[in-house]
């Protein structure tokens, strides 16, 4: 979809996801996968949730109703007009998100949003709005269901395609993944075996010496 492509282009800057409840958790989840999967710094995509880290596990009363707190959190992280703010809210009416997006636009910062409600107040604050129509939830008002699933898919599309554009993927391989456990060391070793035709032991030694599949392959070919 052209609006997904536009948000993908926006995300080549440093980006902030903002949401409350399920929407906020999904933003934090997607942002947290960027360093281990693609080997990029954790500041490239930052997920902010109303109520802070406590709200990842437990509801924080009235946190999403604070229209000023979102922008305060962005300024605490030294946001600039070279960054992007993407609001996530099924209803498109979350004050925490809308307030942050409004102030971002006032400061010349590019904004986008993902919502399930057409013509929402949040979309009115977005330079690029993705409005996905998912229909009624199976349990009325429980937007963690169809809306949450749709949000997750769109976030995946945006960040994955951005990482491909930035050269952090080769083919369909995570060549810049962090080697944080034995499974990933084994996976990376097998990628090198496939790419360079080395035996497993040499490939593993090369991987551990250089720290990533891409660096190991590039170093071997110099």
Segments from the language model and where they lie:
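Single conserved hydrophobic/aromatic residue that forms the stacking wall/gate
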Residues: 1-8, 12
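Predominant activation on well-ordered alpha-helical scaffold segments within soluble catalytic domains
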Residues: 6, 46, 71, 98, ...
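Generic structural signal for well-ordered, non-membrane alpha-helical segments
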Residues: 12, 63, 67, 94-97, ...
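Glycine-rich phosphate-binding loops that contact phosphosugars or nucleotide phosphates
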Residues: 16-153, 162-166
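Short, amphipathic alpha-helical interaction segments embedded in low-complexity terminal/linker regions
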Residues: 162-222
């Amino acid at each position: 979809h052209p609006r997904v492509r536009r948000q993908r282009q926006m995300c080549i800057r440093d980006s902030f996801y903002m949401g409350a409840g399920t929407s906020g958790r999904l933003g934090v989840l997607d942002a947290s996968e960027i360093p281990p999967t693609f080997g990029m710094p954790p500041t490239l995509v930052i997920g902010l949730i109303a109520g802070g880290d406590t709200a990842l596990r437990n509801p924080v009363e009235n946190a999403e109703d604070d229209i000023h707190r979102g922008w305060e959190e962005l300024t605490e992280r030294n946001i600039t007009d070279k960054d992007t703010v993407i609001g996530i809210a099924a209803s498109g009416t979350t004050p925490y998100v809308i307030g942050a997006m409004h102030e971002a636009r006032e400061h010349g910062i590019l904004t986008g949003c993902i919502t399930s409600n057409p013509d929402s107040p949040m979309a009115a604050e977005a330079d690029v709005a993705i409005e996905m129509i998912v229909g009624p939830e199976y349990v009325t008002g429980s937007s963690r269901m169809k809306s949450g699933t749709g949000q997750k898919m769109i976030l995946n599309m945006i960040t994955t395609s951005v990482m491909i554009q930035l050269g952090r993927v080769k083919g369909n391989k995570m060549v810049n993944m962090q080697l944080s456990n034995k499974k990933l060391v084994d996976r990376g070793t097998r990628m090198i075996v496939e790419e360079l035709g080395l035996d497993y032991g040499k490939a593993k030694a090369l991987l551990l010496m250089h720290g990533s599949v891409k660096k190991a392959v590039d170093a071997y070919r110099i």
